[in-house]
């Protein structure tokens, strides 16, 4: 029988601030670890930040810092948020610790020695300007499905999973130049060769019965579809070096090194780390993850351990939750939607209230939508009107009518006969990591305590039957003590406060549940929680709905910045649409060596000779459209005055030698990192409200300029008017 619980929460990636949904795993593991320790089981709770890989390298480029400095910054942010939530890690480390490289490389060398590593030649995008192979998320272009700007792994607009080669007009995210496909060698773990041993381990009844249904279904489906060799190396700089000749400029894929971080983080801080990680006979490895991490913990990490042929502690109990979502919206810092860890701290709502609500709605079997109104209702009814009310009414009654001293009580067997079986059920739910169910069973006991108090009407019987009333209140006091123990994994600060009410006269141990001695007096009492008010909840809902930011976002200059992409192009050739002679087909040079064309109704305004060879400005991210069967990939911009006079903006009026492909930006956006806007329709462009004023193009008084030369965009022929 296994005697030790090794508890892990999925290592959070350290390139962002965790939102409420991200906190589910660390909170879940925290509750289980606290329960385990209260039960007298030797327990170690491990977590830490996952710091290597593409996302970190990319974010460091965006923030103009080094990957390590970025990790240092976000590690501190994560740690401070978890501390506020009162998450009691035994170890909270980092995958950049001093032991991580050695352990990862040793795993690789063992796998290679045992014949589980293969070498393959593949094609990958390479940026000639930056002299690097581009990871999937380093490539941007148009999604082939919806034409929005997308990264090479997935389109955020339509959610389509992509390969970089699927993108239309792919570009390097760093320099915006077009990459080329280049051959490169990578190492793969031979999962098909490990499959039989992996399946034998999975089918072991002691393992599979301790997994959630979603984990079993997903893992079995993955195995049924057939395991494939999986790349374990990447052409990056930020990662663990590959100890193999010819691979000096490559690192291990983050999914390969990250789960090994559980081990290295332990070794970095625990001397007897092998008694935890090389002790599969006695150690019960309990892992808490989200459903997006299931296969890494049920297939990949176990395969690495099995393939090493060493006695590593391997996954036994897996708690894989579904998603916690937000008000039917997407968590997004930039959009101001959803509440993130640092936001929670500023709400004025105590951490135990947040913990309670997350556990109460823990997405164990289905996704859950966080709703502000539901938060208020659940907290006010279950946490306050039920649990907190029982504590307050019983202790207040004792102090008011019988004083601070608790007399030795007569055990009311009928009372406890209802309660004790429920304790056993709750402890079993904890053991099975069914935390939401455990909490709701505890609240049922609290509700029963309130009912017993109400039904016995002690305020009426205190004078006529003082001894019976004292015994009733004393039994309820011991029930409150037990509830504080059972609630300790969920709301630790509140449980400690109740313990202080009784002069710290007991320990948080499951062994004393149901005992009726040890409490001598009530030292003090106070209200545990204040009710959440509707006005406060309404304000918080508005604050984190994105609506408060909408007015600012709808300002024309912000719309332009985020939605409109203007570029300089040169007119190389002009044709007429054979079916509509008034339509000019302009063949353009946009600096990318790609054939681009737009269709515009210019008959009566210009001749071909007047425009050929000129540089104009187009809306480059307009959704493609067809005019009389001819595709148009943008729209030229022109100025129009109040008399309906119409003139195209000619860039030669602003600068002597225009450069095709140069972007038009707001003057106050100089030297800033600019986003690549998605495809838009004409209405979005119109809302930018570009005008010609005193011969210069402006938005809300801000000049439009050429990005590199900084020259202002001029409207020579129509000094005042609208731009259309």
Curated annotation (Swiss-Prot):
Record-linked Pfam families: Anticodon_3 (PF19303), tRNA-synt_1g (PF09334), tRNA_bind (PF01588)
Binding site residues for Zn(2+): 143, 146, 155, 158
UniProt keyword terms in alphabetical order: Aminoacyl-tRNA synthetase, ATP-binding, Cytoplasm, Ligase, Metal-binding, Nucleotide-binding, Protein biosynthesis, RNA-binding, tRNA-binding, Zinc
Motif residue range(s): 'KMSKS' region: 330-334
Residue ranges annotated as motif 'HIGH' region: 12-22
GO biological process: methionyl-tRNA aminoacylation
Function text: Is required not only for elongation of protein synthesis but also for the initiation of all mRNA translation through initiator tRNA(fMet) aminoacylation.
A Gene Ontology cellular-component term: cytosol
Domain tRNA-binding: 560-665
SUPFAM superfamilies hit by this protein: Anticodon-binding domain of a subclass of class I aminoacyl-tRNA synthetases, Methionyl-tRNA synthetase (MetRS), Zn-domain, Nucleic acid-binding proteins, Nucleotidylyl transferase
Assigned EC number: 6.1.1.10
Cofactor(s) the record lists: Zn(2+)
Coarse class of the protein's main subcellular location: cytoplasm
PROSITE patterns per record: AA_TRNA_LIGASE_I, TRBD
InterPro entries: aa-tRNA-synth_I_CS (IPR001412), Anticodon_Met (IPR041872), Met-tRNA-synth_bsu_C (IPR004495), Met-tRNA_ligase_1 (IPR023458), Met-tRNA_synth (IPR014758), Methionyl/Leucyl_tRNA_Synth (IPR015413), MetRS_core (IPR033911), MetRS_Zn (IPR029038)
Name recorded for this polypeptide: Methionine--tRNA ligase
Reactions catalysed: tRNA(Met) + L-methionine + ATP = L-methionyl-tRNA(Met) + AMP + diphosphate
